[in-house]
Amino acid sequence: MTSKVTRHSRLQGALQNAETQGRYLKTFTKHRENGILGTAYYEQKERQERVMTQKRIRDYGIMPGRIKTGKRNKITDVPGVRVGHCTVKEGEIHTGVTVILPGPDNAFLNPYTAAAYVHNGFGKSCGLIQIQELGTLETPIALTNTLNVGKVWDAVAEYVLRQCENDGAEALSINPVVGECNDSRINRISLRAIGAGQVKKAFDAAGEDPEEGDVGAGAGTICYGLKGGIGTSSRVIKVGEKEYTIGVLVQSNFGATEDLMVDGRPLGREILEKYGNEAEDPVKKTAFSEQDKGSIMSILATDLPVTDRQLTRIIRRLGVGIARTGAYTGHGSGEVMIGFTTANRVPTKGLRREEEELRTLTAIPEETINRAFLAAAEAEEEAILNSMAAAGETRGLKGEYYRSLSDILSQEGEIH
């Protein structure tokens, strides 16, 4: 049970945070009404406002794992990494795109050491084969819905071409990396609402403190029969005398309700016991997932010096984090994992000295890699739970009702 002291401290922190938010909102509203600041500024501040008020799994006293988190407990705790979303919610359209930028410069000219692993291949992602073959990432990573992969691929390719043009470089072959989940239960996916304009907005919105929940590529996803979305988490590990960060971002769209585990608790079974009869309610029509199908895209970023082979070993442990939340990887589920490190860049031929025929890498010894394994598993588990805790309830295209994990936990109060 959570102690009275802990609950009191958490309450005091929440009150102080609310007071700070109140002062900020008054100033922000005044400036907006007076027309002092531009549209881009308002959009940025509104995003910050939403981030400040979003609930995450730790706000309910649930602390997954035992390794300390990064400053924000997000993938962007890895220096240089940024995330941007564009969300489209209009009528039957409930979808979006999310971009993960590995660093501030042109990745095509100075690729990142990378790895890709497919646990169960029910999916339509692009760009994985070249990552597996060469061990490098040369573009930002984009996430969207299944039927928009091609359109988003084209937009990412155009983004890289413009970067190369500005850098005075020629790009004749590009490997855009695009992952996907099928959001057709909530989104009219056949309308293919995401194009170049939405991808540009996601790039323009990229920052270090991204929103979670039903935003961007997570706008229309379902996880364990509840509303899913985008979630992120990070862990800090020590190798030698130096600390390194491992961050994870997920697009969650998988799992059967009955299987949901929250920090070791069989919450899914309890949800069905408490709310299961709502499925027959002609008004509420609460939806639950009976099978483990759908997908989860998992992106891991780190500044840990590793080879692409070591990185493959690390991202395979993301599957352990998925299993900790209860899933067993069903036939119709696609688990795709992509990882990159900012530590070992692989400059293209044009940026290398002509006489430089050998490449020197720094890599951790294998006997220290267990720390990274555990960090990856913990961050994945928490990222999934954050994707659900930050998402609100919604209705599907057939009128069915998808509950929010946050609402369920709020009704229970403290669960530990």
Regions found by a protein language model. Name each.
Residues 7-10, 35:
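Intrinsic, low-complexity polybasic segments
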Residues 19, 27-44, 48:
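Short, positively charged and aromatic/hydrophobic N-terminal segments
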Residues 52-416:
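Alpha/propeptide regions of enzymes that mature by internal proteolysis
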